[in-house]
Amino acid sequence: MMKLFVRFYLLAAILMIQAGCGSKAPTPIVPDPPQQEHQEQDETNKAEDTMPSEIKITVSGKSLPVKIEDNDATRALVAALREASITYEAHDYGGFEKVGGLGRSLPSSDSQITTQPGDVILYSGNQIVLFYGSNAWSYTRIGRMQYGTLDELKDFLQSGRGNITVTLSL
């Protein structure tokens, strides 16, 4: 009887050992990518997240920089410009501005503003107004064109000479 118990315990021990020794391959250890790749990606993300200080307005092959505000409207505009330039038609209005529809809406935070020549303004959330004169109204400021003289600005915007094609870009 003792031999039977010994054999039983031996058989049970062998079965337990075999059950613990499966045929599953060990999980490979994958090294972390080099730290430099993470840094390059972080720098790319930071560059994309960084708000530029200027955008560019082009009319008839000539361009002017626009020093932009830091607000929701300009952040949305810059995000759109990172995808592609925006081109729209603008027309004279009131003898002091060129206005045109963007074909999209931007967030607005209108407040009473007295504009000056060179101001770039968001009106009604979906129109860009380029001022070569002055007006007081409730607008969201986008920025200010960097130009020489008032005559040069009026010439750039072709004030009083009909519609123009405006391209906004980074």
Task: Please report, for each region that a protein language model flagged, where it lies by residue.
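C-terminal motif of bacterial Sec signal peptides marking the signal peptidase cleavage site
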Residues: 17-20
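N-terminal secretory signal peptides
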Residues: 52-95
